[in-house]
Amino acid sequence: ASMSGDDGYMTRYSRTAKDESSPEVPLTTIVAKLKAKGLKLGVYDSPFWYHYTNPNAVIPGTDGIKVSSLAYDPAKDKDIKHPGSKDQFGWVVTDHPGAEQYFEGFFKHYSDLGVKFVRMDFLSWYEDGMNYTDVIDKGYGRERYVKGMQWINKYAQKYGVYVSLVMPHLRNNALIERYAGNMVRIDADALEGSWYRFSDNNRGSLRGGWPNSENAFDGFINWSKISGRKKIRLDGDFIRIGSYADDNEKMSVISLPLMAGGPISITDMPTGNDLKFFQNDEMLALNKDGFVGQPLERNLWNTDGEIWYGQMKDGSWVIGLFNRDQAAATRSIDLTKVGITGTWSARDLWKHADEGTVSDKIEAVIPAHGCK
């Protein structure tokens, strides 16, 4: 795919058809087609990247500063982490003149197009050039990274753009990412999907840099420490529903992001029986409510990390019992431990069935990789 434009910002995108040689299409055309269907366009782009076919394009709001001047200059940019490494992208060096105006122009450009969602990737490569211990890129340093994040916060708010941050190191408990973004990735890429990527891959291991967790379940448990209503949303990456072995796994991969307050990001084309997992209105009501749950304990091995709870705006409580194990197992929660007292009517949100009343305790046998 190619992302290109004549003024330093993306105005055209290729690969809009299943054809390697499909022509570039103006974003305005894509926006119009989606609008006719009642849909909105989100883009994959970053103000840390520059796109140009015209290096002499002038940055908006500057006195003739060219977009090409934002690029790395070995003659003056001396404090780079890995100067001998090859840049994987055209990075904007944020202490170059015109960089802030370029960032503002980025958000204005998309806002003017009617694009209100931007997903920004490879942030760790900009900050220090690293994938945990592997050197990938030059790395422009924490100071330049923080400066760019401050501008993202400032101008995304000014132009009403929702910011999705991908591949950050999340240092200092995601201090700068919580400030700058609306949503943040908390685990390694879903890649081919499957329960292995969702729950088993390197389970129980936390790192100090990207990716902090190798599976989404660990990521949601660990980073629940920064989530909550009107706080940054946790993004467990895309859902390849067709990669899961059975209905139990499919219900779990939909339920956990919703219990954690995260998005449901459809990746493959759900057909036949798989479509229903994305159409459960009772589960999707959590997303509409702004619900954000928490695990009983932020523990990657103890079953308390598999029991989630939270409260809806109407005062009702949602309990999620999960089973990461290879065999059926009992999961239970003492309701008084989370401040729930009295007798409550119970309903199964996947079966769409009332289940009488509960008080004091909820307990159920959960199938392998399943939930309730």
What are these regions (language model features)?
Residues 47-113, 122-124:
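Active-site-adjacent "subsite" loops/lids of carbohydrate-active enzymes
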Residues 1-66, 97-102, 143-150:
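Aromatic- and glycine-enriched glycan-recognition loops and surfaces
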Residues 94, 126-152:
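Active-site cleft segment of glycoside hydrolase catalytic domains centered on the general acid/base Glu
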Residues 1, 43-45, 106-136, 163, ...:
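Short acidic catalytic loops
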Residues 153-352, 363-372:
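Active-site-proximal substrate-binding groove within the catalytic cores of carbohydrate-active enzymes
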Residues 35-42, 113-118, 157-162, 315-316:
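Loop/turn elements at helix/coil->beta-strand transitions in domains of secreted/extracellular proteins
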Residues 357-361:
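Short alpha-helix capping/helix-loop boundary micro-motifs
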Residues 2, 47-51, 122-127, 168-171, ...:
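Solvent-exposed loop/turn segments at secondary-structure junctions
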